[in-house]
């Protein structure tokens, strides 16, 4: 089984490392415009792998042909979000990068599924889908899984125990919200305080250390695992919607079933209030796409 990563910076390389540690990988390919970085990270990963008696083929470089045969390609390349910058501020800067990456992936690894991480992630997921021409089950985005990890951490610290399900859905950004009707845990919490904490905690991490790294890496690993091991796990995922929840022609976070065919929207009922919030997220994202000519 082969994994591809476009972007060998901190999120891309840490995600590759997390997958290397936890999955049965035959090959990993790292592609980055900074060729030396990609080669160096590949070498470092290979040395780490040998320490746990794993010897997959690990390659790095700037040539997209390295991605050929990847079961799934994780795209983290793009300009990073800076302190004080919203995810949507990044849209104009990263849209051109994603458009170019989409073309190169299709030319070199047309059968691969694509997991988009580059922010603003929902907008970039839609652009990747549109520019690649791939079926919508093969292009999806990571955002709400990370938000949901943050939610679980906040819930636990607020007194929740045995957290069986806790999901954030909607935009990976300011209009995201807790799917309270689907939450399942023991104990009582102050939902308003918890939701407010989750909404702003990423900015706090960025303010203190410059970027979020470990949280995204684990979220990416969880989604990659579900695909390559065909687990069918339901994970909050940015999906291209074509009528689901009364939403069309936009990528937004909803519960999705992940497996060998990629991602498909899960048949899960939301409350009327949650559907309204989801449609609000979708409206905001559609407006951003229109500003970019999509």
Swiss-Prot record:
GO terms for molecular function: L-lactate dehydrogenase activity; L-malate dehydrogenase (NAD+) activity. The active site is at residue 172. Homodimer. InterPro entries: L-lactate/malate_DH (IPR001557), L-lactate_DH_AS (IPR018177), Lactate/malate_DH_C (IPR022383), Lactate/malate_DH_N (IPR001236), Lactate_DH/Glyco_Ohase_4_C (IPR015955), Malate_DH_type3 (IPR011275), NAD(P)-bd_dom_sf (IPR036291). The keyword Nucleotide-binding does not apply. Substrate binds at residues 81, 87, 119, 150. GO terms for cellular component: cytoplasm. Gene3D superfamilies: Lactate dehydrogenase/glycoside hydrolase, family 4, C-terminal, NAD(P)-binding Rossmann-like Domain. Pfam families: Ldh_1_C, Ldh_1_N. One of its GO terms (biological process) is lactate metabolic process. NAD(+) binds at residues 7-12, 32, 94, 117-119. It catalyses: (S)-malate + NAD(+) = oxaloacetate + NADH + H(+). This is Malate dehydrogenase. Its EC number is 1.1.1.37. Keywords: Cytoplasm, NAD, Oxidoreductase, Tricarboxylic acid cycle. Catalyzes the reversible oxidation of malate to oxaloacetate. Can also oxidize tartrate. It comes from Archaeoglobus fulgidus (strain ATCC 49558 / DSM 4304 / JCM 9628 / NBRC 100126 / VC-16). The gene is mdh.
């Amino acid at each position: 089984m082969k994994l591809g990563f476009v972007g060998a910076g901190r999120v891309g390389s840490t995600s590759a490392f997390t997958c290397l540690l936890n999955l049965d990988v035959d090959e990993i390919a790292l592609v980055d415009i900074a060729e030396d970085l990609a080669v160096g990270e590949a070498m470092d990963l290979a040395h780490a792998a040998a320490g746990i008696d794993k010897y997959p083929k690990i390659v790095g470089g700037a040539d997209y042909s390295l991605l050929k045969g990847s079961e799934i390609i994780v795209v983290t390349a793009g300009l990073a979000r800076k302190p004080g910058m919203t995810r949507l501020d990044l849209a104009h800067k990263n849209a051109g990068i994603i458009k170019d990456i989409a073309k190169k992936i299709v030319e070199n690894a047309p059968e691969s599924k694509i997991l988009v991480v580059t922010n603003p992630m929902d907008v970039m997921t839609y652009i990747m889908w549109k520019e690649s021409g791939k079926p919508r089950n093969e292009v999806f985005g990571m955002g709400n899984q990370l938000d949901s990890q943050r939610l679980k951490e906040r819930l636990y610290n607020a007194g929740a125990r045995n957290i069986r399900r806790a999901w954030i859905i909607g935009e990976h950004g300011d209009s995201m919200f807790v799917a309270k009707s689907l939450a399942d845990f023991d104990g009582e919490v102050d939902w308003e305080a918890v939701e407010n904490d989750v909404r702003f905690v990423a900015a706090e991490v960025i303010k203190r250390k410059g970027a979020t790294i470990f949280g995204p890496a684990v979220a990416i690993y969880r989604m990659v695992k579900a695909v390559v091991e065909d687990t069918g796990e339901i994970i909050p995922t940015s999906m291209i919607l074509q009528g689901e929840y009364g939403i069309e022609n936009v990528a937004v976070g909803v519960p999705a079933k992940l497996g060998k065919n990629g991602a498909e929207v899960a048949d899960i009922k939301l409350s009327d209030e949650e559907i309204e919030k989801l449609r609000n997220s979708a409206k905001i994202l559609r407006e951003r796409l229109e500003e970019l000519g999509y």
